[in-house]
């Protein structure tokens, strides 16, 4: 290796042979940054002095190159990495930064690296000067790159005064970061300054929190800060701030009141804190806020009491004053707990002072305290406004008067009632209730005349005509049409007045047209008690003219009952006229009772023919669900009077008019009647008629009844006919179900259903054609006849197997479910019952196969399944007859 030395400008430079090409390039291009950087990269692994020398030479030629300065400073910082801050090399690097800033003072990256490097040396003052110089040298648009490092520096070391001043300068440029300043102040225990900053941002309506906190959350932080640190926050008026929050944030009153009280507690001003708690529970308007304040208040009193008791117990020289102080604190705590319900009631009344129920509850809480009760009632009736009252206002006046009455102050009670009748209630019923309660109080005091006079005052007619429902008039002017007042007036007249005055009251009620059916009934009973029967009947008739159905039902009931009790059958024509008048417009739901009463009258005092006529009319006049019962009564009465045969017409009419459900039962009863009379054929015809509305799947009881009837009174022919009808009805209902399903599908499927419907007739014609072909083929084949003609029992011959073999099977045969098996079982029962007839024939056995053969043969002849229409004639007999 050869070392060459170049002397120039008193600078001796030693370089190796490998450096010669780079040196030559530099000589040729001394002002080329690219060639210097290439040389620096070549010397990257050389000793520090060699690299630094190349950098120094480059910067001497190109002092304005930011790239060379940045790389040089980064290289020098790497060289001191791992060394202690007192190493001389640190000063060399600092000197390099200072020389760089002579040319690069507008480059923020250089200042940032210098500031971070100085911070790592823990030289506080010099670092602060560096950051200050950077802020002065750089334009304000680039200060945002310096401040984070500056703030990180002042927070890293414990220098609160410096940090406060730095933050204040920073917030002038970035006021939105005040929350970070507040956090630092709390960490540095500078709570007074923190409270001031928080108060400032809370008052600033344009402040937007970077952490997403609302103004309300910031306010809560301020309250917590100033209330929990009363000895460290001196610059703010805590009481004024929190009270301002009470006016501003009405949904957090409980928390704010507790914060204010807590401030005075921590300040040692316990009496002032107690005053705050008392003020709070007397002003909050929600149960939630009251609960928060009351719990804190109770806890404060309890802790105060316990601490004082501990102090007295620990002090051996405790005096009587100490014991008195303990007793005072204990009394305060007990008094607070006793007042809890009253205080809560006060909160609810502050929410709505027109809540009548809460006023009543407050009176209950003042039990055994007459003065407080009177004061509460007085305040209540003065506070509650009639149009805003929640509840019944008149109950306050009534209970107030009853309280005086219970304590023997009747005159005061009368004064209260008098005042209560002058209140402008919303409804007339409220005023009427006050008058009625007043009259009842007079009755309890045995002042009957006074009670009657009160009712006379209440019902006095006004000078001009006033409508009851005219809200523009006062309730006092409309009271004369109150039914409640008139009803009580009538009761009082009945009890303490004369017949004439009581009758006048009832007549006046009727004239005003405010009576009810009950008033009419009471009036009639009153007249009857005094033996004015015709007057009573006229009263009933007046009521009937005033009311319509169904309200007039009770009047007619009383009228007719009383009339029949008195006259019975002596005035039959008049009674008939009354019943006809009653039933003329009587609705079906009320007709049954009156028709039965009418019929009973005719039975007992009139003609049987008239009674039957009434029953006949009743069957069509009552409700549909009562028609069945009415027909049963009609039939029973007809049987008693005329005998069973006369009931046939009634049964026939019932079957025609009753709905299906009841018609079935009526048909069965009719058939049983005919059976009793020995008319078996008529009974069978009734069963056949009823069977058309009896689906075998639903009304199995009916078919079982018919079967039992045939077993007792029929023969094989009738049994087979019954089974045929059963299959026919079953097929009919199946067809109806299929039709409904088809209609449903056509509705849902639209065009597809239309296409399917068009294909239906073609398919049916195809089936009919196949059936005709099968019938023609079957006629060409010989069919052996049975040796003997058995009437209605299918027998088996030697040719039976051949018949079954030659029978043409129809693949489109209709299956009627299990009717075939049922048919075979029923046929077996018929054979057992008719053994006398079967003994005349040869040995006969019935099998499913033969039944199938007969079914197929009948199908071949009729072109449809034989079981659908049924037949009692064997197939071979039909063929022979045809031949």
Swiss-Prot record:
Location of this chain's protein in the cell: Nucleus
InterPro entries assigned: HAT, HAT_Syf1-like_N, HAT_Syf1_central, HAT_Syf1_CNRKL1_C, Syf1-like, TPR-like_helical_dom_sf
Pfam families tied to this protein: HAT_Syf1_CNRKL1_C, HAT_Syf1_CNRKL1_N, HAT_Syf1_M
Residue ranges of HAT repeats: 13-45, 46-78, 88-120, 122-156, 158-190, 268-303, 368-406, 463-495, 531-565, 570-604, 642-676, 678-712
Keywords: mRNA processing, mRNA splicing, Nucleus, Repeat, Spliceosome
Compositionally biased residues, Acidic residues: 812-834
Chain spans, region Disordered: 794-851, 864-883
Major localization class: nucleus
Feature: compositional bias, Polar residues: 835-844, 873-883
GO CC, any one term: Prp19 complex
Disulfide bonds: none
GO term, biological process aspect, one: mRNA splicing, via spliceosome
Other facts: Named 'fandango' after the Iberian folk dance to highlight the similarity of the blastoderm cellularization phenotype to the charleston/kuk phenotype. The phenotype 'faint sausage (fas)', consisting of a poorly differentiated cuticle and head, was previously associated with the immunoglobulin domain protein CG17716 but is now known to be caused by mutations in the protein 'fandango'.
Role description: Subunit of the NTC(Nineteen)/Prp19 complex, which is part of the spliceosome. The complex participates in spliceosome assembly, its remodeling and is required for efficient spliceosome activation. Essential for efficient pre-mRNA splicing. In embryos, efficient pre-mRNA splicing of zygotic transcripts is essential during dynamic cellular processes that require rapid division and/or dramatic changes in gene expression such as blastoderm cellularization, tracheal branching morphogenesis, Malpighian morphogenesis and epidermal development.
Subunit composition and interactions: Component of the NTC(Nineteen)/Prp19 complex composed of at least fand, Prp19,CG9667/ISY1 and Cdc5/CDC5L. Within the complex, interacts with Prp19 and ISY1/CG9667.
Family stated for the protein in its record: Belongs to the crooked-neck family.
Name the record gives this protein: Pre-mRNA-splicing factor syf1 homolog
Organism: Drosophila melanogaster
